[in-house]
Every structure is written in C-alpha cells, then in structure tokens.
A protein has these predicted regions:
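Serine residues within intrinsically disordered or low-complexity segments
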Residues: 2-4, 9, 17, 27
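Short, intrinsically disordered, low-complexity terminal segments
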Residues: 15, 19-22
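Non-catalytic, conserved peripheral segments adjacent to functional cores
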Residues: 28-130, 138-139, 143-146, 151-178
C-alpha cells in the first residue's frame, strides 16, 4: 500500500527504520518475519466472537435496504488460535492471503471434511474453499499466524450466525482436536 492511501507503514524484524513496504521491494519479505500483532494493527482488526481477529472490508448495500449480495472480511488466527464451531445462513468462501496454513473443518449432514488452505502452489494446500450455507465450520492456524479473507453471499448478517457452545462438535465428528 502506498502512503497516499492513508495507511501507515508498519515495522518488520528487519530493523527499526524498516517498513513492510520498503522491505518487500523488490523481493517479498517472508511472512515469518512479520508478527501477528503487526498485521492486526496494520489492518485494523478487532476480536471476532468465534475467535480470531477480523475487519469487514466490503458490504454490498442495495438501494432497497434489503440484504446485500455479499460481504468480505479479513480474518486472522494467531498461532494456536481457533475459530470455534459456528455456522452462517449463507455460502462462505475462504481465501488464503498470508502466513502459515489454515485447517478448515466442515460438517454438513453426514458429510465431514477437513481442508488445508495455504500457499496456492503447495501440493497439500488449496488457496480457497467454500463452506455451504448452514454447514458447521471451524478453523485453526497450523504454522504460526494465518491471514485469510472470507466472502459471504448473500451478505453476512449476525442474525444468521450461530456459535456452538464451547467443546461442542458436530454429531459423528471423528477428527481429533476439534
């Protein structure tokens, strides 16, 4: 991001006067040199009720005042942090942006799966995944912090969000650690 967009530069572990913008030019600075707290501050993220950090970046506002066609957020999980089991009443696409890998658990009726999101060029990862409407989902960071985007359609509304009780898991869920 350029300084003209109103956002401040943020430091990395490359030195006291270095900024991410400067450090990444001309080659990309590895994500491991950036601390999660720096990403949280830079992107203006706030705590999410399901765990993790987020900020809404886009919301369709229809002229008739009804529910928009979509919303988008940044969502960050710190090392060891989870997004607890929850579901929403709309389809949700997860997109990997930076950091380590993310494990996304999805439970819909009798179909259960765990997907790994990460570097798009990695053979064991996908760059994105879609959770169907009303399917239970949970996520966890695998390798340090992870930054993803979540796009919900139709637009996310907290009235359509259900957070499961702590330690709850979907019926017949057989994956350990969830």
């Amino acid at each position: 991001m350029s300084p003209s967009d109103g956002r401040r530069s943020w430091p990395c572990q490359l030195g006291p006067s270095a900024t991410i913008d400067a450090a990444r030019a001309p080659s990309r600075t590895p994500d491991w040199c950036i601390d999660a707290s720096e990403v949280i501050e830079h992107l203006g993220l706030v705590p999410h009720p399901e765990g993790g950090w987020y900020r809404e970046t886009w919301r369709d506002l229809p002229a008739d005042g009804g529910r928009g066609v979509g919303t988008a957020i940044y969502f960050l999980l710190e090392d060891g942090q989870r997004s607890h089991w929850h579901r929403v009443d709309a389809a949700e696409a997860w997109h990997h942006y930076a950091g380590g890998r993310l494990e996304l658990a999805i439970a819909e009726d009798d179909h259960h799966q765990v997907l790994t999101l990460g570097d798009a060029l990695s053979s064991d990862c996908e760059p994105q995944a879609v959770v169907p409407p009303r399917a239970w989902q949970a996520a966890r960071a695998l390798d340090g912090w992870v930054l993803v985007g979540c796009t919900v359609s139709p637009a996310f509304d907290f009235s359509g969000f259900e957070l499961a009780p702590p330690e709850w898991a979907p019926a017949a869920w057989e994956q350990p650690g969830w």
